[in-house]
From Swiss-Prot:
Organism of this sequence: Methanococcus aeolicus (strain ATCC BAA-1280 / DSM 17508 / OCM 812 / Nankai-3)
Protein name per Swiss-Prot or TrEMBL: Aspartyl/glutamyl-tRNA(Asn/Gln) amidotransferase subunit B
Subunit comment: Heterotrimer of A, B and C subunits.
GO molecular function: asparaginyl-tRNA synthase (glutamine-hydrolyzing) activity; ATP binding; glutaminyl-tRNA synthase (glutamine-hydrolyzing) activity
UniProt-listed NCBIfam families: gatB, PRK05477.1-2, PRK05477.1-4
Catalysed reactions, as listed in the record: L-glutamyl-tRNA(Gln) + L-glutamine + ATP + H2O = L-glutaminyl-tRNA(Gln) + L-glutamate + ADP + phosphate + H(+); L-aspartyl-tRNA(Asn) + L-glutamine + ATP + H2O = L-asparaginyl-tRNA(Asn) + L-glutamate + ADP + phosphate + 2 H(+)
Keyword Repeat assigned: no
Alphabetical GO biological process terms: glutaminyl-tRNAGln biosynthesis via transamidation; translation
Pfam families: GatB_N, GatB_Yqey
Keywords in alphabetical order: ATP-binding, Ligase, Nucleotide-binding, Protein biosynthesis
SMART domains listed in its UniProt record: GatB_Yqey
Record function comment: Allows the formation of correctly charged Asn-tRNA(Asn) or Gln-tRNA(Gln) through the transamidation of misacylated Asp-tRNA(Asn) or Glu-tRNA(Gln) in organisms which lack either or both of asparaginyl-tRNA or glutaminyl-tRNA synthetases. The reaction takes place in the presence of glutamine and ATP through an activated phospho-Asp-tRNA(Asn) or phospho-Glu-tRNA(Gln).
Length: 469
């Protein structure tokens, strides 16, 4: 029997705003760097009579910026008030979470509708296995992005979140995947039978969201195939087992008893406020990709790879500016940043900022190669050494200390070539009988003998002269 199966997924993505203080008090937000329950005060501990401060302006600015960059309409000249969303859990000392009405609505990102963007406060951290709660995180500002149920596969969800995190990286002042959490809403349609929506709470990685959707799609499909009914419920992701587990029946909005917070005045966003935020908005990754292709004439794939890491994109532009914008210089910058630098960073499992290299290190390296002070092979070794020593030494210092400059003495090169010819008579005979590739082997022997300090084209020239005598 033919099956027609499809899924719909919507995401509720929570990302922390990197502010110095919490959303409604002056407590610091560096909760991971201090002892438990030290960054707290009567406000974030919900002591009787403790009144919250007006919401952190930087957090509101960031919510506006995120909404704008996701194509949302900003809610202008209307009261944006905070509500109390009631539920009982050990990490929520007040018994309610303060969450705003939408700051932005009706957006679109990568073809996925954005229902709304709003602000809320993060709860504390409850560790049920130990029975302890750390309230340092309580009150940290969060931006919540609610998508429409437009995502049709686990792969689409993974790409959507990957691109969203890249956008957060460009915006700045938003903490990345390590602090991101997503609530995953999924329903399955099996042969025309539409199942109920299931929510999987607090999935804390892109990989986790992908695994949840793969598992839930199969679980719900199998239930519907047997003629069963999908329960409308909230489930938890058991990461170790890669399964989801029922927690409780799905709440409705009424279950949370939303009421306006009487301790907080509403905020009103006007056009002037939005304009101030827009002036600080960065170029989006998609716009930067397009500009790189148009301005520098590079391939779209090269642009995508470099733009994926904002630091590398900035390095590329700096290096091109220092070398000059001639086509040859742009090509060299692409090769040494997109290929070689990324290769070494990936091998060491660090990013460019962690390497502590500077753009001028890459510029100097390329200039040493184009000036024939070092060979390309030595250039690759130098870039590896620079990353290993965290940028403490420049390329010039490295090649001087290790004696890696190009051998430009023809006499020295000729001696090395003669030895290679004498030691590899079969390869020489193969070359003389028409096998051009055999010469490459002999070139390799010369390069090995000179520790990569010979220019390959010069070696080829000398070998041909000696062999054809």
């Amino acid at each position: 029997m033919d099956e027609t199966v499809s899924m719909k997924c919507g995401l509720e993505i929570h990302v922390q705003v990197d502010t110095n203080s919490k959303l409604f008090c002056t407590c610091p937000t560096n909760y991971n760097e201090v002892e438990p329950n030290t960054n707290i005060c009567p406000v974030c501990m919900a002591h009787p009579g403790a009144r919250p401060m007006p919401p952190n302006k930087k957090a509101v600015d960031m919510a506006i910026m995120v909404a704008k960059m996701l194509g949302c309409e900003i809610v202008l000249d209307k009261d944006i008030y905070f509500q109390r969303k009631h539920y009982n859990y050990p990490d929520l000392p007040s018994g309610y979470q303060r969450t705003s009405v939408p700051v932005g609505e009706h957006g679109k990102f990568l073809g996925v509708g954005i229902t709304e963007v709003h602000l809320e406060e993060d709860p504390g951290q409850y560790k049920p296995d130990l029975g302890v709660v750390d309230y340092n995180r309580s009150g940290t500002p969060l931006i919540e992005i609610v998508s429409d149920p437009d995502i049709k596969s686990p792969e689409e969800a993974k790409e959507f979140l990957r691109q969203l995190l890249r956008l957060f990286n460009y915006i700045g002042n938003l903490r990345g995947e390590g602090s991101m959490r997503a609530d995953v809403n999924i329903s399955v349609n099996y042969n025309g039978v539409q199942g109920n929506r299931v929510e999987v709470k607090n999935v804390n990685s892109i990989k986790g969201v992908y695994k949840v959707l793969k598992y839930e799609f199969i679980r719900q499909k199998n239930i519907l195939r047997r003629g069963g009914e999908i329960k409308r419920e909230t489930r938890a992701f058991m990461e170790a087992q890669l399964i989801t587990k029922a927690m409780r029946s799905k709440e409705t909005a009424d279950d949370y008893r939303h009421i306006p917070d009487p301790d907080l005045q509403p905020i009103v966003i006007n056009k002037e406020w939005v304009k101030t935020v827009e002036e600080k908005m960065p170029e989006t990754p998609m716009d930067k990709e397009k500009r790189f292709v148009e301005q520098y004439g590079i391939k779209l794939e090269d642009a995508k790879v470099m733009v994926a890491d904002l630091a590398l994109a900035d390095v590329f532009e700096t290096v091109v500016s220092e070398l000059g914008k001639e086509k040859e210089n742009i090509s060299l910058a692409v090769i040494w940043i997109r290929n070689e630098l990324r290769r070494v960073l990936a091998y060491n499992n660090i990013d460019f900022l962690e390497s502590r290299l500077k753009p001028e290190h890459i510029t100097e390296l390329i200039q040493l190669i184009t000036g024939k002070t070092i060979s390309q092979k030595i250039g690759k070794k130098v870039i590896e050494i620079m990353v290993e020593n965290k940028g403490e030494k420049t390329p010039k210092q490295i090649i001087k200390e290790l004696g890696l400059t190009v051998i430009d003495s023809e006499a020295v090169l000729e001696t090395a070539c003669k030895e290679a010819i004498e030691n590899n008579p079969k390869a020489v005979d193969d070359y003389l009988t028409g096998n051009e590739g055999a010469l490459n082997f002999v070139v390799g022997q010369v390069m090995r003998a000179t520790r990569g300090r010979a220019q390959p084209n010069k070696v080829v020239e000398i070998l041909k002269k000696l062999i054809n005598k």
